Amino acid sequence: MKSYKLLTPGPLTTTDTVKQQMMFDHCTWDDDYKQITQEIRRGLLKLAHVFENEYTAVLMQGSGTSGVESVLTSVIGSGDELLICANGAYGERMADIAEHAGIKYQIYKEHYNKVPNAQKVAELLDADPAVTHVAMVHSETTSGILNDIEAVGKVVKDREIGRASCRERV
């Protein structure tokens, strides 16, 4: 069988050393496994620039979609409203998840070959103060587009979207 170099978001080509490590059976109760898990969790918190006494990282096994579903259904409360910026199949899948979970949402659809416009997001947020959360795919693999999360994130941060909702639950 021919060996291919897969330059795609997934499935990924892995090295023999990675494959060999994946063959090792780890017991979740072993101290070395727990130590590795804790290091990963601490590293994720560091990456997010947050502290262990305020946040935790939960490692999950599953597809990217299962991770998105977990976030949307655990972070967004019954009185919250979500704005989804979609420019591909994975952004649209967030709307499907929200629909099935009974999450109140609106969707800003952009063409598959265009990045969601931060100014348009600002206009949508200004027009609807009920929006408490904004979701957008960073790397929309259906089109190969890397969305400008910095620009959209600034718009969201400037309007303190999500902060009031989080404070109410604490």
Where are the predicted features?
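General beta-strand structural signal in soluble alpha/beta enzymes
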Residues: 6-8, 58-61, 84, 107-108, ...
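Short coil/turn connectors at secondary-structure junctions
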Residues: 1-3, 54-55, 78-81, 102-104, ...
